[in-house]
Amino acid sequence: MSNLLRVAVSKQKRRYQKNGYDLDLAYITDNIVAMGFPSEKVEGVFRNPMKDVQRFLDQYHKDHFKVYNLCSERVYDHSKFYGRVGYYPFDDHNAPQFEMIDAFCRDVDAWMKEDSKNIAVIHCKAGKGRTGLMICCWLMYCGMWKNTEDSLRFYAALRTYNQKGVTIPSQIRYVGYFGRSIRESIKYVPRNVTLKKIVLRPLPKEINLSEVQFNISVGKNCVFNSKEHNMNVVISKKKKTVVDKNKKDPKKKLTKENSEKNIDSQQQQQSQSSLSQSQQGQSSPNMQSLSASGTISSGSNVGTVNGNTLHQLGGSQFSLSDLADGNTIGNDEYISFEIGALSLAGDIRIEFTNKQDDRMFMFWVNTSFVQQLEIIPKSGLDKAHKDKNHKAFPEDFHVELTFDQLDQQQSHTTVVASAEEQTNNQHYPQSSNNVATSSSHHDNITVVASDAPQNNNNNNNLNSSNSNNATTTTTKNNISLASSQSNPVQQESNPSTTTQVSEENSAPKVEAEKIENSNASANDSETSSNSSS
């Protein structure tokens, strides 16, 4: 029963199921292992039992393993792994501090160089997203892969059955950042920038924009909350006329939505009329425009600017503007939050919520990699990227971040790696049994990787010389994988998959297992997920 629970919890992740073990664990290379959290007590029933993980590592990699815990939400006594534990914590479904990635890679690098038998065992809670981010960065750090997308696809193929390895857009973006820093030999220095404006374009659906809120954090420290700051916020909406095709009279039949718009328009005209009689409002530097359908639920009118009514909500003001049909200049719908001048540096998280603080979407960016106009598409927004049917956000929805003029010299310092550093970075692909070659940057990737443990105690392979190899051919559309890690569920549903066990310590081999790449091609964030660059 416990084994069934573990398989259910691990979902599409590859498991180590041989030699008496059933662990949420996969060899990404000969010396890099990804696994789920080593758990105790009740949690050990459906996750990796701590005792089984200890026994596995002692049996196959005694004195030659170091465990890396990426969980910020849970820890364990480091003595359980003889004190050989690296701790690089960051929150689930979030990106790490950029400096932490480099520190992690240097730690693994130092450990690997101590002994050729040494392995790194890396885990978060599920052992997939955060774990994959760090492993993909390491694969580029050590020189095994140069391209971000190739590294992500390689990890996805070796860790999962459905090719969904690192799936959180912000985490993918940070793999891209790190890949760029490696390729361009960038010595990272946080850049100070000034955020001026955030634009959501087109307007999100199924939400009253008067309830849209957002906060901006540097790391975990919130530095701006829209609920506590007055802003100049503008909504631009198209005017639409609905015609009854039967009677051809636009006044005969209107949709509920447009009826509400007409009522709102009348209310605005009445408000403008009364205001013009009582007072003339002036343009305020702190305006706020917040309404999805033009409906103002509360507040009072304070004046007009360029023919648009200004409204008061709390301490803020906002304006509404309509775009006439056929307008060729700016003929789209958007909401613009003009923040003014917010100084930022380093890892930035921006989260949009509704009035009940339910998350709409969020994303992480690093100021050293942004453009002056940073455009993040829907596919690059955490949570919003899951809206495949475009119910909450239009298909072309995106976020625009406008920064003040950026000092490119301040962004980072470029250094040329020394001959010794270049040699060290080439150490792993040459010395490892894992060979990774890219025959075409965009078409085919052929990798040979081992998932079977080696008993470093007696320096003997547990398997025959070739039985532990997994050959993966990755194309733009699919991944063909021959792996020694078998999925019993898929074996039942795929009659073409065969498993052969030659002896007790031999790994079963799955021959020519075809796996559709349902994750398509991961977004290569090497250009900061920026469509403007």
Curated annotation (Swiss-Prot):
Bilayer topology term:
Peripheral membrane protein
Q: Where found, per UniProt?
A: Cell membrane; Cytoplasm; Cytoplasm, Cell cortex
List cystine links. Answer: none
One Pfam family, short name:
PTEN_C2
- Could you confirm whether the keyword Glycoprotein appears in this record? no
Member of which family?
A: Belongs to the PTEN phosphatase protein family.
Name of the featured protein? Phosphatidylinositol 3,4,5-trisphosphate 3-phosphatase and dual-specificity protein phosphatase PTEN
Q: What organism, scientifically named, is this protein from?
A: Dictyostelium discoideum
Q: What lineage is on file?
A: Eukaryota, Amoebozoa, Evosea, Eumycetozoa, Dictyostelia
- Identify the gene encoding this protein: pteN
